Amino acid sequence: NYPEYLLAPLMNQELNPAIEATPLRWTETSGEELKNYDMIIFFGMGLNFTEKQQQLLATLKKPLYVTASTRTETALNTLTGRQREEIAAYLGNGGKENFRRMLDYIRYEVDGKRLRAARPQPPKKIERHPFFHISEDDAFKTYQEYLAWYKKTGRYKENAATVCLLSGNGGGALEELIGALEKKGLNVVAANGMWNLLPMFEVVRPDLVVYQPHGRLGEKAVELLKKYNVPLFCPIKVSQPYGEYLRDQRGMTGGMLSQSVTMPELDGGAVPFVLSALYRNNRGLLEFRTIPDRLERFAELVRKTTDLKCKPNSEKKIAIIYYGSIGREAATGGLGVSESILNVLKRLQKAGYTTGPLPETAEQLNEEIEANNAAFGTNAGNSAGEKAVPRVQTVTITPGEYHAWVEKSMPADLYRTVTERYGEFPGKSFRTPEGNMAIGRIQFGNVILVNMPGAVDAA
């Protein structure tokens, strides 16, 4: 009953041809199939046995061991003390080599099949080094050692940003993420485990941290993120086959949503972006892989974010999408849209962003907003259509431009739901006689304001 994604990387190697290791799904009706195996290892976390299964296991007469058990009734073991210690050591040290050695040990010592079999090698003690790259062998005790190796192998880019991945050791989906970030011209270091977070900040001083969370960080970690002004990106690892995830309209639910999105946001985590899901490998086992189109988008977002830390505010470009306007619309009445936007613009100007001259009052800004609404086609601005406001511009988008954006941002089947509801580009609301799309914007230097369109009925 081990999760397949834990076994998949361990079994992705050449194993003893005399041994067959089979992952079995464990349900309330499981049990009889265990009679076909010579050794049974259960993953104890969350494991349950029905009364019938308990009776079957008690009479099975097979070597049986339950790891990581959280309940007394599932903490079963029929091995000798020595056998249990050895298998626990193989599993505890982890890695492909120890998994292969454990299978040889089970066949030789537990099952007693010794004919033409070499004596199995003992568990290999694996040191847990804090800093690592892709391979299990590329792990280092200090960041200085890692950096020396990183430079020696030609990966280091002078004056480039450094991204730290907080994760467990090993490759898999992590290998693809490291490769994608390095292709963007970034330096990458992986830190093994949350226990290493505090000293890692002091020695690495990363420009951005990527962490696939399950719960909250400690208060000290949050303080360090603030102290060094380090963005924390928290992409999501979906524990479902990718096809199932796409078909499930609920997305993430319950505890997984809370632990992977809500709790990390309390620590300042951003970008809850689905980055990886489960796929079948060539052995038929489910393993985590990054979703190809999403990997590229995420890596580009990381690059742009690190670039922003180095770029002067005067060169940064910002789009503000606002909802509604002052006045008659019930949905936005009393929200102070113009006042809020003007306060933001003044704050940006004070921080050195290029805004050009700003309106003196919220009322002046609202005139421009209503004129923009008219250009944008929302009913709030219909009465302002005759006003001429220099900063209000109509931007034309061609079919080629639009479809290039769509192809880059959403799957084809998802876009079909858009066209089924609103028709083909450019739709009804923003169509020009030439078949392009025209939308309105208000420009203040490097900052533009765009109104989010309301629902449009057939009329």
Task: Locate each region found by the language model.
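An N-terminal assembly and electron-transfer interface module characteristic of large anaerobic redox
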Residues: N1-A459
